[in-house]
UniProtKB/Swiss-Prot annotation:
NCBIfam families with a match to the protein in the record: tig
HAMAP family for this protein: Trigger_factor_Tig
Keyword Chaperone set for record: yes
Record-annotated PPIase FKBP-type domain positions: 163-248
Taxonomic source organism: Streptococcus pneumoniae serotype 4 (strain ATCC BAA-334 / TIGR4)
Localisation: Cytoplasm
Domain remark text: Consists of 3 domains; the N-terminus binds the ribosome, the middle domain has PPIase activity, while the C-terminus has intrinsic chaperone activity on its own.
The protein's role, per its UniProt record: Involved in protein export. Acts as a chaperone by maintaining the newly synthesized protein in an open conformation. Functions as a peptidyl-prolyl cis-trans isomerase.
Annotated GO CC locations: cytoplasm
Protein name: Trigger factor
Amino acid sequence: MSVSFENKETNRGVLTFTISQDQIKPELDRVFKSVKKSLNVPGFRKGHLPRPIFDQKFGEEALYQDAMNALLPNAYEAAVKEAGLEVVAQPKIDVTSMEKGQDWVITAEVVTKPEVKLGDYKNLEVSVDVEKEVTDADVEERIERERNNLAELVIKEAAAENGDTVVIDFVGSIDGVEFDGGKGENFSLGLGSGQFIPGFEDQLVGHSAGETVDVIVTFPEDYQAEDLAGKEAKFVTTIHEVKAKEVPALDDELAKDIDEEVETLADLKEKYSKELAAAKEEAYKDAVEGAAIDTAVENAEIVELPEEMIHEEVHRSVNEFLGNLQRQGINPDMYFQITGTTQEDLHNQYQAEAESRTKTNLVIEAVAKAEGFDASEEEIQKEVEQLAADYNMEVAQVQNLLSADMLKHDITIKKAVELITSTATVK
């Protein structure tokens, strides 16, 4: 294999490489054996056409494309490795020569990893806005939240207040004409919940069951239904019932209803205090890690971040997001319809985040390289076992999904993050 690389501009160049006849000939033989099985040529049994007759009738060149498709991926990977390149985006491949009896010549326009000039990344001073201490108010807030979850709705005679639930019928119209989606019957609406467009719920406060209220609202300018956006509407709303939350007493019985593992309210408070302390400690560690890494990134200089890297990160993030939705039974079309957004909107949403994440990844990789971090076979095996446990998979499944190089990369990245974080101090 002959390999050369020519820099064209920052982080871009042309990689030229060859595929030798030593590789081409056996691949052409393999392709021919596969192709001849389906050939019907007069005078020969199906699948028994001799190679010289094939070459005479169709030309050896008829096999070239399939052979190239098979040989190119490994040849490109080998060329990148031999040239010592770190390619960060899909290449633009061009087959420049496929002459009979000659080595094939291919060029690839590639984008390479940008240079990272590291600044300080160890012994950093950082600020975090996360409290580690658990207060009585924290514990009481969590218990109150659980207490409210056990509340029952009880019909009340008095006028509706914020926090109450009303059961209503409503008919919406614009300039006296009803519109699609503007009607509902026996709808339970929590006042103050923000379920309906701004102003709707507020106008029901102070009214009682049996009353009919003309609710006048204006649809937001960015409302998903474009034909309604920015328009004033009237909703004739009849209140059937007003219900108030009735929360259970704050006692030992409540504690047992919330958590069957405790016997008293004091037990529940102690348990919640420990859980909140663990959660706050984890949040504090995450905040320190985030602040330290952000500082290391700010201290570094990246020489011209290629747009292709950002685009690939956006694409990866969007696919990951949509994949998570599909696992929940929501397909992309359904999501875009519900949210009134498009694929382009989603890409734009991830754009800024992708640029930041790409810079962060580059700096952490540069730290790992500068520190000479590596991963032993023992560490790789331990990582595989941990991933298998985390995702409830067999070890063999993880090994099939992730290559040793991918696992080694992840381990070295973790070591770099640990170095940046563990040496940081909080102001």
